[in-house]
């Protein structure tokens, strides 16, 4: 199962990208290179014991697969336990527990593709990995990037992006937007909005019939709006990939109507790595990941917010309700997949298969 194995990797290099963003490069030993082979767009899950509590976070891979080692980009989150530790305590030579690459923010990259990318802030992290890889390996591919930040100084990977642009003048269209810094071009002043994307489409700067795939990465509100626009113009026949960075916690109307549970105790049977285990849920509000942690049962998870899909599993028996879902597609839910971090049982017995995730 991808992303479920872990090793202690040494921090080879720390590099500040901005005052609030840092790139960590991990040294991958030769005997682990196969395990840490990744597809551009995937992420790593890190784990560290902080103040007697084991914390996990997912961070997208920023490096090109051609690199000898593997890098991630991290932005400081106000009051964020993990990012605060990274910025205040982590040093070169330290070791962190790093799970093998996981994630589904990718498509079948081919020659002669026309790809559109929209990113905000740290959402550039997986996208720069994809762009670097596509420009290097896929002939005659055209890439258009629309990248929003507050200021030039707060822009992650700006030097690397500009270098890619200079090396690929005909194949990379690089468009910066700054919300609080004046721009010579009025259109690029302010945030990336649905109105601006609509203008680009109506002005034929983005031609829906020529687009082979769209990648969206950033805050929840931006991603949801952009996804609606591109689905309207491009339809369902072409991939529109999305990844959320730091959910805005926007409450959807349907989330207000939470079903009430009548059972006091629920039995959860799980299958993982070919072994079946049982978990008891004594609290009707407890999700499956938290119950497993309480009983010292190791299950794959990371964000615990319904965003990363690391805890995706298949419901074989029983029923569950998803509290939040920002990563499962409709077809996945129809086939019985759920997110263990957000799943709360509706029946007194549930059987989940993590091996078919």
Which role fits each region the language model picked out?
Residues 85-261:
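FNR/FR-type flavoprotein reductase catalytic core
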């Amino acid at each position: 199962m991808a992303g479920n194995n872990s090793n202690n990797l040494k921090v080879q290099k720390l590099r500040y990208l901005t005052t609030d963003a840092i790139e960590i490069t991990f040294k991958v030993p030769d005997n682990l290179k196969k395990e840490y082979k990744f597809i551009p767009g995937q992420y790593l899950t890190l784990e560290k014991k902080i103040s007697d509590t084991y914390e996990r976070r997912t961070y997208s891979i920023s490096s090109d697969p051609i690199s000898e080692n593997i890098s991630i980009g991290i932005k400081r989150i106000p009051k964020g336990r993990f990012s605060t530790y990274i910025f205040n305590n982590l040093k070169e030579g330290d070791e962190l527990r790093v799970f093998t690459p996981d994630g589904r923010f990718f498509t079948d990259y081919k020659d002669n593709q026309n790809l559109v990318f929209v990113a905000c802030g740290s959402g550039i992290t997986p996208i720069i990995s994809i762009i670097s890889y596509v420009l290097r390996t896929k002939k005659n591919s055209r890439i258009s990037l629309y990248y929003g930040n507050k200021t030039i100084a707060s822009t992650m990977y700006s030097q690397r992006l500009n270098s890619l642009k200079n090396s690929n003048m005909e194949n990379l269209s690089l468009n910066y937007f700054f919300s609080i810094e004046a721009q010579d071009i009025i259109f690029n002043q302010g945030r990336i909005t649905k109105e601006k994307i609509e203008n680009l489409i109506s002005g034929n700067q983005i031609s829906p019939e020529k687009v082979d795939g769209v990648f969206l990465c950033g805050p929840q509100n931006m991603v949801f709006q952009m996804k609606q626009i591109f689905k309207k113009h491009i339809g369902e026949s072409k991939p529109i990939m999305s990844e959320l960075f730091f959910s805005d916690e926007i409450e959807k109307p349907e989330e207000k109507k939470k079903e009430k549970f009548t059972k006091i105790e629920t039995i959860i049977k799980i299958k993982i790595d070919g072994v079946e285990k049982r978990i008891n849920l004594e609290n009707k509000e407890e999700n499956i990941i938290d119950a497993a942690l309480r009983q010292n049962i190791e299950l794959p998870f990371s964000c615990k917010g319904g965003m990363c899909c690391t805890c995706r599993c298949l419901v074989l028996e029983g029923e569950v309700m998803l509290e939040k879902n920002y990563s499962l597609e409709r077809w996945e839910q129809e086939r019985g997949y759920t997110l263990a971090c957000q799943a709360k049982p509706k029946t007194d017995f549930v059987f989940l298969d993590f091996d078919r995730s």
